[in-house]
Amino acid sequence: MRLVFAGTPEVAVPSLDALLASEHEVVAVVTRPDAAAGRGRRLVASPVARRAAEAGIEVLKPARADDPAFLDRLRELAPDCCPVVAYGALLRQEALDIPRYGWVNLHFSLLPAWRGAAPVQHAILHGDDITGATTFQIERELDAGPVYGTVTEPIGPRDTSGDLLERLAKSGAELLVRTIDGIAKNELVPRPQGSEGVSYAPKLTPDDARVDFTAPALRVDRLIRACTPAPGAWTRFRGTRIKLGPVEPLPDAAPLPPGQLVATSRDVLVGTATHPVRLGEVQPQGKKAMPAADWARGARIGDGERFGDD
């Protein structure tokens, strides 16, 4: 089949590569416009745009998905199907109607659970043991179209959202190719999503990523892992923001008041509402990430100092 692939971030690149290696023809990609990045705020093409350029494929970067020039070019390309992975913009009905077999989205949850922009983060945040990826036909309602297929993935006790997304990007790419193969051979009929088990996963903001050490250790651990690498968990120390990497809950350790820091030559412990957690890496404002023990030696943490104090 003739395909136009839509995607933007790094997590979409394995799917593009898998489709390029398949028997189908990727005639173009659609991605978000170049965005400012780095300290110099220089415009940088998306990972999908860069990969497509390497492969010699036409790249479309509409500012709006209903841009008339974009829609005209999409019609000229005459795709049979448009696979989508984390494109990052809502598609209008006029665009949805162009390909003969519609737009097929790869979503990183087991729908109807965790519809929305941050399914992996919410799966970790809420303590799910299993997640996965789903291919489905895009319709106007968010992530609610009929399902072609799924693949499951266990969530490990130390998984971050970055770890989990990396695995799902690979297994999801294989699922997407199998789905496109099945559609091309008229072997797949999508099934409607059920009305039970629907949940939503809105994008996590920096405010959502602030760690509350008056919460139980389990919740602190899940929040930090869910927000790693993005948007990045953080707290405040001596009036400045400090980012926190994943922690290790210590259920057998002596309790500490929430947020209170205790540093040894090897470890830094922080109190929560239940038991302490051991810090891994921290990143003080304006500095690079470093082991928590190195940070504590440089900061010369005093008795009774705590995270969260402004």
Swiss-Prot record:
Alphabetized Gene3D superfamilies for the sequence: 3.40.50.12230
Xref: InterPro entries: Fmt, Formyl_trans_C, Formyl_transf_N, Formyl_transf_N_sf, Formyl_transferase-like_C_sf, Met-tRNA-FMT_C, Met-tRNA-FMT_N
Biased composition (Basic and acidic residues): 300-310
EC numbers: 2.1.2.9
Binding residues annotated for (6S)-5,6,7,8-tetrahydrofolate, in chain numbering: S109, L110, L111, P112
Pfam families reported for this sequence: Formyl_trans_C, Formyl_trans_N
One MF term in the entry's GO annotations: methionyl-tRNA formyltransferase activity
Swiss-Prot/TrEMBL catalytic activity: L-methionyl-tRNA(fMet) + (6R)-10-formyltetrahydrofolate = N-formyl-L-methionyl-tRNA(fMet) + (6S)-5,6,7,8-tetrahydrofolate + H(+)
UniProt-annotated stretches for the region Disordered: 283-310
Keywords: Protein biosynthesis, Transferase
GO cellular component, one term: cytosol
HAMAP family, A to Z: Formyl_trans (MF_00182)
Similarity-based family: Belongs to the Fmt family.
Function: Attaches a formyl group to the free amino group of methionyl-tRNA(fMet). The formyl group appears to play a dual role in the initiator identity of N-formylmethionyl-tRNA by promoting its recognition by IF2 and preventing the misappropriation of this tRNA by the elongation apparatus.
Protein's UniProt name: Methionyl-tRNA formyltransferase
Gene source species: Thermobifida fusca (strain YX)
Source species taxonomy: Bacteria, Bacillati, Actinomycetota, Actinomycetes, Streptosporangiales
Gene name per UniProt: fmt
